[in-house]
């Protein structure tokens, strides 16, 4: 896509739209996009090899590259998209479990909702590929702006951040390729921390170029952000180098439960209405989390001049 976009720069906007329209309300993306719309893997009860899950890197690394190229080509149009509610959400029949269930078994964290899948297929028969998208009660496509879409992707990763270790790989898939399968559940990604910091700095810079103080986002996303921001302030001064395992688990469980509460709401009822988000508050939050990432990045720097790519962790649910 990058090579194609460099040859045909007018395609950047369409590429970004295709990518973001296929991300879900819980911050992940489906298996693939075909001429029939978004597609996902299906659990087959009689096939022990059938499997579902979300790869952890797609939502940040790939879309960041597209956004950076588009910003270099047409920055004014990118700023227009920031507040335009033209993006959709993929309606994937995967339900990520509660934090307690994830902590108890981080290798088995997603349920396939057969009833929801069948309802979506009925909607596809009625509406075409739009039936695979998140809809309102009147069966219209639910739309969000670029700010909300980027915020959802960011919060999904931040809520799985383990201080000193990276982003927890707890959605039944690895990153990059199947060579990392052993990291599923008991691994963390520093690769995504490095890119997420770059992603958030790009996001922050974009907000500073928008000549408004507040922006409309879905109420449920705003409440999620407010809880994460408040909890992040609580842990603002933790030392990532000396943090105890007990405090680290407390940090992880605090954000994990916040994310779980958000997912429970949207899985049951979707989005309701929109409310104003303060861009100053968003920028301050991004600065705080990036400072925490800096500490973790230093911890993962080796004397040979290289940075660690992945770590392993042991989640003790009794904490």
PLM regions and their residue ranges:
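Acidic, mature catalytic/reactive cores of soluble proteins
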Residues: 1-319
């Amino acid at each position: 896509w990058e090579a194609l976009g460099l040859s045909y720069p007018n395609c950047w906007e369409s590429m970004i739209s295709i990518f973001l329209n296929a991300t879900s309300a819980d911050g992940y993306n489906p298996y693939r996009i075909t001429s029939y719309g978004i597609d996902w893997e299906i659990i087959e009860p009689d096939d022990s090899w059938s499997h579902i899950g979300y790869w952890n890197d797609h939502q940040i690394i790939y879309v960041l590259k597209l956004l950076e190229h588009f910003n270099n080509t047409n920055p004014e149009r990118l700023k227009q998209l920031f507040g335009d509610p033209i993006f959709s959400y993929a309606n994937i029949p995967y339900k990520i479990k509660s934090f307690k269930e994830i902590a108890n078994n981080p290798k088995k964290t997603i349920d396939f909702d057969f009833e929801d899948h069948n309802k979506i297929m009925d909607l596809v028969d009625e509406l075409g590929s739009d039936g695979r998208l998140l809809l309102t009660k009147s069966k219209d496509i639910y739309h969000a702006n670029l700010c909300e879409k980027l915020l959802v992707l960011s919060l999904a990763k931040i809520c799985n951040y383990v201080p000193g270790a990276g982003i927890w790989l707890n959605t039944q898939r690895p990153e990059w390729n199947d060579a990392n399968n052993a990291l599923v559940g008991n691994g963390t990604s520093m690769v995504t921390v490095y890119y997420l910091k770059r992603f958030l700095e790009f996001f922050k810079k974009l907000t500073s170029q928008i000549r408004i103080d507040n922006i409309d986002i879905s109420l449920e996303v705003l409440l999620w952000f407010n809880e994460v921001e408040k909890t992040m302030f609580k842990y603002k001064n933790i030392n990532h180098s000396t943090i105890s395992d007990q405090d680290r688990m407390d940090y992880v469980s605090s954000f994990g439960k916040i994310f779980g509460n958000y997912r429970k709401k949207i899985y049951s009822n979707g989005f309701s209405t929109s409310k104003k988000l303060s861009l100053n508050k968003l920028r301050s939050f991004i600065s705080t989390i990036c400072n925490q990432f800096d500490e973790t990045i230093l911890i993962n720097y080796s004397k040979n001049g290289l940075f660690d790519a992945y770590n392993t962790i042991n989640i003790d649910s009794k904490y």
